[in-house]
Amino acid sequence: MRVVFMGTPEFSVPILTAIIGHGYEVVAAYTQPPRPAGRRGLELTKSPVHEKAEQFGIPVFTPKSLKGAEEQDVFASLEADVAIVVAYGLLLPQAILDAPRLGCYNGHASLLPRWRGAAPIQRAIMAGDSETGMMIMKMDAGLDTGPVAMAEKVAITPDMTAGELHDRLSMIGADLMIRALGALERESLALQPQAEEGVTYAAKIDKAEARIDWSKPAQDVHNTIRGLSPFPGAWCEMEINGAVERVKLQRSALGEGSGEPGTVLDDRLTVACGEGAVRLVTLQRSGGKPLPAQEFLRGAQVSKVL
């Protein structure tokens, strides 16, 4: 079976690796173009999928768009049986969707139709969901609206971070995709339309959302911290040794106590919220590494969180 793989971030890599490892012929990898990196932006960094594909000698394509006739002709010339799409980052025009003999299949990190869109892992945690999952669906022209081929549910534990859920779903996605490809080869892959009820959208994370609002209830603050950990990272400003610093909050837990929002309640860095309190477990000062709260507090007197 001739496969075109389309993906960009680290989340996609285990699925690409599994497809290769199970002997499928990956004739091309499509991924986002290299991005400027470094302090001056003079270096170009290839995506994780780009690097992995090159390790296996797979031709890599990095178009900025697939809307043009020339790019669509190149894609069609690959004569793919199927395209596998996992967090690629570009919309696929109908001409691309129609090109593979068996269609295009997407690995999506939610229980559709909940959390269609760009940031399903973060949004599920930020909303306080108790479960999510991984789904394989056949793509159509809509945004994550195609019929579902396979799904597996995953519990979201109370302190689970987006990073932890990301890694779990990525590995589940690799297993599901291999099973889906096998069923596709055997012509036994059954498709079920998505439910019409329960549709929600996982909008891309806005930078403004990452700043913690201590006037919100503790559960909301906790969900935001774990939903944005490790990236982009929730943050706040702290008065440390009399100066205001910006600090990233990588891990938290629900705490006990109450007070004016932003007040540090004890020597464990429990901070009062609009309702309840949150204990800050892992923090990161600018230019530093993530530290447990007790280590963070060595030589740092925190008087207030802003």
UniProtKB/Swiss-Prot annotation:
List of residues binding (6S)-5,6,7,8-tetrahydrofolate: 110-113
One CC-aspect GO term: cytosol
CDD domains membership: FMT_core_Met-tRNA-FMT_N, Met_tRNA_FMT_C
SUPFAM superfamilies for this protein: FMT C-terminal domain-like, Formyltransferase
Catalysed reactions listed for this entry: L-methionyl-tRNA(fMet) + (6R)-10-formyltetrahydrofolate = N-formyl-L-methionyl-tRNA(fMet) + (6S)-5,6,7,8-tetrahydrofolate + H(+)
Family: Belongs to the Fmt family.
Organism in which the protein naturally occurs: Brucella anthropi (strain ATCC 49188 / DSM 6882 / CCUG 24695 / JCM 21032 / LMG 3331 / NBRC 15819 / NCTC 12168 / Alc 37)
Protein's UniProt keywords contain Protein biosynthesis: yes
Keyword list, A-Z: Protein biosynthesis, Transferase
Name of this protein: Methionyl-tRNA formyltransferase
E.C. number(s) listed in UniProt: 2.1.2.9
GO molecular function term, any single one: methionyl-tRNA formyltransferase activity
